[in-house]
Design a protein with these regions (language model features):
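Positively charged n-region of N-terminal signal peptides that target proteins for export
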Residues: 1-4
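Bacterial N-terminal signal peptides
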Residues: 6-16
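Eukaryotic scaffold repeat domains enriched in small/polar residues
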Residues: 20-363
Length: 363
């Protein structure tokens, strides 16, 4: 099927109608602030996978340094969690020596300023209080296996209630129930109550077809998740190049596609120029603002853009950026924090930095 203007729209039964975007989208008026974080020379960042901001404006940076201890890097301690104040001044490091930290994938603050860290390799979700003490752990880290269990078996192992396999992200609904993106290999959403008790799961591995519009509810890596005030659960179904929207019980509501035209002949940062590049690109991140109305920000790896969507419709309002290495360019934007629609922090993974974006004229 050929796209209509900027966004592909398919006529489906009412619960499956696609969010629509206009025929053209504008460039978002963001500018990137040089050197937004202040730290010493011995704290150079490595791959930055995620960033979060609490109610005080303090910034948490999830860093993967080059100081892993003996053993396979992926299965050992290669995670640092740095805190900076609202002015970007270094405050402290959190989580040193915590058993469930190995190769952390995402950090999020809940509405109580508790910090949650989702670890892909340790297959754990860890809750820290504002002081930095561990309050809860979901999942369980393997006991130093000889063979790395994070590798996908063929066929993949059967998911187990309460355990994860390549966990990616966490979100909460208005009743404080916990939703975990699980993950690289289980490809499901796991739901717990606020005490950490298992409730249910939904999803499971499956493809979206050539145009990413088939098999609703099937997921290929729920890479990021978020929940709005209307209890819509947004899942960045990265492997299927789509955002899936569910209610809090896991009932599918609609797809949203990042189907804004781009230069398909522009060479990607990594790899050869693909022969058949799809119209829709793969969402990597999700951040929903605590504003009225709410907005959803997301990114893709190629062509390396940031997208702003209006909720709950999912209409794309604009894009910003492109892939590259310079300030204002992105090289695998792996996480977003969105304190407001005019202030964003982006975990610019392969550029080894955090970019701070502000709307021009609103510094």
């Amino acid at each position: 099927m050929k796209p209509l203007l900027a966004i592909a729209i398919l006529i489906l039964p009412a619960p499956m109608l696609f969010a629509q975007a206009g025929p053209r989208v504008s460039t978002l008026p963001f500018e990137s602030v040089p050197s937004p974080l202040k730290y010493s020379i011995d704290q150079n960042l490595g791959e930055v996978l995620s960033v979060a901001v609490n109610s005080r404006g303090h910034i948490i940076v999830l860093n993967h340094p080059g100081t892993a201890t003996a053993g396979p890097v992926y299965g050992n301690a290669t995670t640092q969690i740095f805190e900076f104040d609202a002015d970007g001044k270094y405050v402290r490091e959190l989580g040193r020596g915590v058993y469930g930290l190995a190769y952390a994938h995402s950090v999020r603050f809940d509405k109580y300023d508790n910090l949650w860290v989702v670890d892909k390799a340790a297959m754990s979700v860890i809750k820290f209080d504002p002081a930095g003490y561990v309050l809860m752990n979901l999942g369980r880290r393997d006991e130093g296996p000889d063979e790395p269990h994070y590798r996908k078996a063929d066929p993949p192992p059967t998911p187990v209630d309460g355990l994860f396999n390549g966990s990616t992200d966490v979100a909460w609904d208005k009743d404080d129930n916990i939703y975990v993106g699980d993950g690289y290999f289980n490809s499901r959403i796991a739901k717990f109550d606020k005490h950490g008790n298992w409730i249910k799961q939904w999803g499971g591995p499956g493809t979206g077809g050539v145009h990413a519009n088939e098999n609703p509810g099937h997921i290929r890596n729920p890479h990021n998740i978020g929940i709005d005030r209307d209890s819509n659960v947004y899942v960045a179904d990265r492997g299927n190049r789509r955002i899936q929207v569910f209610d809090v019980d896991g009932n599918f509501k609609k797809f949203i596609f990042l189907n804004v035209p781009y230069d398909k002949m522009r060479h990607p940062v990594f790899g050869n120029l693909p022969v058949d590049r799809p119209d829709e690109t793969a969402p990597w991140t999700i951040c929903i603002t605590n504003t009225t109305p709410q907005y959803l920000f997301t990114t893709d790896a190629e062509p390396g853009r940031l997208y702003k969507l209006q909720l709950p419709e999912g209409k794309i309002l604009g894009t910003w950026g492109e892939s590259g290495h310079e300030l204002g360019e992105l090289n695998w934007a792996h996480g977003i924090a969105c304190p407001s629609e005019d202030l964003l922090y982006i975990a610019d993974m392969n550029n080894w930095r955090v970019q701070k974006l502000v709307t021009k004229g609103k510094k």
